[in-house]
UniProtKB/Swiss-Prot annotation:
GO terms for cellular component: early endosome membrane. This is Lateral signaling target protein 2 homolog. One of its GO terms (molecular function) is zinc ion binding. Negative regulator of epidermal growth factor receptor (EGFR) signaling. A zinc finger (FYVE-type) spans 845-905. Residues 592-602 have a biased composition (Gly residues). PROSITE patterns: ZF_FYVE. Residues 351-361, 463-475, 486-495, 568-580, 742-751, 816-826 have a biased composition (Polar residues).
Length: 907
């Protein structure tokens, strides 16, 4: 049976494709390719195309004949997105022939030797299938048949069926091995980890919708901004909210997904800082991650401000553990001095508060105090062996000059990540979160237990020398200052089992107790005695005091133990000139703890104390909460945005699934309206047509029925419908303004007059058509203009009953203008107020296998890029230009193709 060239059946198409492929292969074998390299290259390209066509038709035949008996290819889910192309089958066939001929994949000699027997089996099985299909084409072909009509009782048909099954199984096995050798393929464990990350993304999105960080409308419209917001919020949620999820940094590094494994150490440091944030600070950070707007706190808050700490090793709903000791964090203090030194006299009155020192850097916040003299702080740094004289306010202000932690803006392009994206082998330096001192202190605390005992003994000795152990009450009874208050953390402590946490001296839990904590505030003395109040502050990282009862002390003595490793000066001390009387005392009273503790529990408390001091050291480094939130934003956004480059295909697939899961269910379609009423109302735009932009409140007209219709241009308004207009013609022949036929309630301030009329001044923009003549029957101009009602008043007459809802546009008394000048001015105003156009639809990646400019095929190294102006798909070279697109509301430069760049910019 002859097979015609115009036959469209599967067997006929296979027959002609196979003949063309055989002809190209025969021509390649007829000459020496090294002698004619150009001809050889051209024929090899034709050979690859012929193989693609033959295998594509063979796959269609196997789909029809084998059906559900085809070999499973679920492993393709582990392949990178760039590998799954139409030409994959042809590449596999070409690779199998090369391996069967003795060639090897470059730098993959071992894998090539392993695959060579399978490659030979694949090529042999494929040759057998081609021969059987050619025979079937000549015996059982039905011209232009849409389906295969083979004789099931024929032995050749049964042989073809079994041969196709064998080839399909061998080809699937070879596909998995060959692709795994050529590119990095996910393991089963990694695939499951990424599924868990997808679940984390979905949980994060649902939480963001619940707390109001995002809106359901953004999800339904597939807002591109969510591509960045969801991964950023997921990092925060995975570190401090869903702590047992895929971002659990306490598990071994091998159990963390490859997406976040390079940032493991950075994520650990970010987690520790996130757990010190209050709920308000965490909300501000998440809002910043969504909007990139500047942080606006209600007041200038100190670093440790707040009674609630986010995180702490357990869920926020967990109950506190009353069996633990109480933990008091002294946030900021303010000390006053009544000094009668002859050399001082009367000096400017200041109140020094929140005095933090880190590596000889100070941040001083001064507040006026009407009753007190200058505060004095004589701070000593025994580690570095230098004294700082702070009696002179000039020295204090001079030392208060501190460089900003990060001078760049909040946007990622302005930030140099430098040490941000470091691997596990290179620890971060103090330019971001941790400092070398903290790392040394952490390693020292984890390695030397004897050092802890020495620290505690030194602290107890200092407290004894300073008179902290005395039970003499303070004689001051002045009201406490607002800037000085204790904060009790409510998080239990548990030792971390992670080796990395031990190296960095990090403990994942906090102390927690139901006990009360009291702090005696400094109070001015209005007596003839000369008293000097000295306030000692901790100079290294944090103000931290913990209630510990000394075994050698009396049962009634209440004191505070501060870690000497952090050089914590106690908040209770005496002045040399005060005769030993304590001028400031901080005490902590436990609710039910014993006064004595065993040596084992003391060692554990000491280790926990040092670890907590190390944890809070990173936060004290930042002088304000805004600096801390800014730094966390830079780090979190840097990690999340880096995923857009390293795992672009995986991230797109995850976010696509998240959008599908969390999008609103489709609303039931309304019955079609009658044709007569179809022209009365402007057509509501399809949500699918709105890619990025939504109408603002000023651009939405709300009818009495509650429906919202977005007006994007003047063409959507029917200004000539007399039945739909409630406005009369204003003086001067202006055209009637279109409005809803139903009565409308306008939420503005109205002033009523004696005759019952109401004058309403509004500031909205109404689109109307310009009149071409003086009479109502005159022809109207096609040009449209916008009338600003801020220059007019709407007078509603409520006295008459026959003209319900009638309103007139009355121009205010102003300088008379001609109609032409008014039209030109209003036309310019319309251009100003015009809504941005809807951006073009993006062509799906699957519909563009080649660049739409240079026709180059996309590969794992030549990626797709969309032009924001035309929506086309281009390679990086053809879409390297950038230009702002004001017509779409894009005021910043975005990616455009070369043709659109020339058209928009004109160069």
């Amino acid at each position: 049976m002859l097979v015609g060239a115009d036959d469209k059946s599967l067997l006929a198409r296979f027959y002609h494709a196979d003949r063309a492929l055989t002809a190209v292969a025969s021509e390649l074998d007829s000459f020496d390719g090294r002698a004619e390299p150009v001809r050889c290259t051209r024929l090899v390209g034709r050979l690859r195309q012929g193989q693609d066509r033959v295998l594509a038709i063979t796959n269609q035949i196997m789909d029809e004949l084998l059906g559900e008996d085809r070999a499973a290819r679920a492993f393709r889910a582990k392949f990178p997105e760039e590998v799954l192309q139409e030409s994959l089958a042809g590449q596999l066939w070409f690779g199998a022939e090369c391996l069967a001929a003795g060639s090897s994949i470059m730098n993959r000699e071992v894998e090539s030797a392993t695959m060579r027997p399978l490659a030979k089996a694949v090529t042999k099985s494929l040759d057998n299938v081609r021969n059987l299909l050619r025979e079937q084409c000549l015996r059982n072909n039905t011209p232009n048949s849409l389906t295969l009509r083979l004789d099931v009782n024929d032995a050749a048909t049964e042989q073809l069926y079994e041969s196709l099954k064998i080839f399909d199984r061998l080809f699937a096995e070879f596909e998995l091995l060959y692709v795994s050798a050529m590119v990095q393929v996910k393991s089963k464990q990694e695939y499951e980890m990424q599924e868990l990350i997808c679940v984390l993304f979905s949980e994060t999105l649902q939480r963001a919708l619940k707390v109001g960080l995002l809106e359901q409308e953004q999800v339904d419209s597939y807002d591109p901004a969510l591509m960045f917001s969801i991964p950023r919020l997921a990092i925060v949620a995975g570190l401090v909210i869903f702590k047992e999820g895929p971002l659990n940094m306490d598990q071994p590094a091998d159990d963390i997904s490859e997406m976040f494994r390079p940032f493991r150490k950075l994520l650990i440091k970010m987690r520790d800082l996130l757990r010190t944030l209050t709920k308000h600070e965490l909300y501000q950070l998440e809002k910043l991650l969504c909007t990139n707007e500047e942080i606006s706190l209600k007041e200038q808050q100190i670093i440790c401000d707040g009674n609630e700490i986010v995180g702490g090793g357990q869920s926020p709903s967990a109950a506190p553990n009353p069996a633990r000791d109480d933990t008091v964090v002294i946030v900021t203090t303010s000390a006053t001095v009544n000094s009668s030194d002859n050399l001082r006299g009367q000096e400017p009155q200041e109140d020094i508060s929140s005095f933090y020192t880190s590596n000889n850097r100070r941040t001083v916040d001064s507040e006026p105090n009407e009753d007190d003299d200058v505060s004095e702080s004589n701070d000593e740094d025994e580690d570095e062996g230098e004294e700082v004289d702070e009696d002179d306010p000039a020295n204090i202000l001079k030392d208060a000059l501190v460089t900003s932690d990060c001078a760049s803006g909040y946007l990622i392009p302005n930030t140099n990540f430098g040490n941000l994206l470091q691997t596990n082998e290179a620890p971060l330096t103090d330019s971001f979160i941790a400092t070398d001192e903290e790392l040394k202190l952490a390693s020292g605390a984890a390695s030397s237990h004897a050092r802890i005992e020495q620290i505690l003994s030194e602290s107890n000795q200092k407290l004894t020398d300073s008179g902290l152990g005395t039970a003499n009450p303070s004689l001051d009874h002045s009201p406490e200052l607002e800037t000085e208050r204790p904060v009790t953390s409510s998080h239990p402590i548990a030792q971390s089992s992670s080796s990395s946490s031990e190296e960095e001296g990090e403990v994942d839990e906090y102390d927690e107790d139901d006990s009360e904590s009291t702090l005696c505030e400094p109070k001015p003395h209005h007596t003839k005695h000369q008293r000097r109040h000295r306030h000692h502050h901790h100079h290294h990282r944090k103000h931290y005091s913990k209630h510990r009862s000394s075994a050698a002390g009396s049962a009634g003595t209440s004191g505070t133990t501060c870690s000497a490793a952090e050089r914590q000066i106690s908040s209770c001390d005496t002045s040399p000139s005060s005769g030993g009387l304590p001028s400031e005392c901080g005490s902590s009273t436990s609710g039910g703890s014993s006064g004595n503790s065993s040596g084992g529990s003391g060692d554990a408390d000491a280790a926990q104390e040092v670890a907590m001091a190390i944890r809070a050291a990173g936060r004290i480094k930042f002088k304000t909460t805004e600096n801390l939130l800014h730094r966390l934003f830079v780090c979190i956004a840097g990690v999340a945005d880096q995923l857009q480059t390293n795992f672009a295909a995986d991230l797109r697939q995850m976010l696509k699934s998240v959008f599908v899961i969390n999008s609103s269910p489709p609303e039931p379609e309304d019955p079609p309206e009658p044709a007569a009423n179809s022209t009365d109302k402007p057509k509501e735009p399809d949500p699918a047509d709105l890619f990025e932009f939504r109408a603002s409140e000023q651009d939405v007209i709300t009818n009495s029925g509650g429906s919202s219709q977005s007006i994007y241009s003047a063409e959507e308004v029917n200004a000539e419908d007399p039945h739909d207009s409630v406005f009369g013609s204003p003086p001067g022949g202006a055209s009637p303004v279109r409005a809803s036929s139903a009565p409308r309630t306008m939420m503005t301030t109205a002033a009523s007059s004696e005759n019952g009329s109401v004058t309403v001044n509004v500031s909205v923009s109404v689109v109307t058509a310009g009149s071409g003549g003086s009479g109502s029957g005159s022809s109207r101009s096609s040009q449209e203009r916008s009338v600003s009602l801020s220059e007019t008043s709407i007078v509603v007459d409520g006295s008459g009953g026959n003209t319900e809802g009638t309103a007139l546009l009355v121009p205010r008394e102003s300088t008379p203008k001609s109609v032409q000048s008014e039209q030109s001015g209003q036309r310019g105003m319309m251009e100003e107020r015009r809504m941005p156009e809807a951006p073009p639809r993006w062509i799906p990646d699957g519909d563009a296998p080649r660049c739409m400019a240079c026709a180059s095929s996309f590969t794992p190294f030549r990626r797709r890029h969309h032009c924001r102006n035309c929506g086309g798909v281009f390679c990086g070279g053809c879409s390297s230009a950038s230009a702002p697109l004001p017509k779409y509301g894009l005021t910043k430069a975005v990616r455009v193709c070369r043709e659109c760049f020339v058209r928009e910019v004109g160069v």
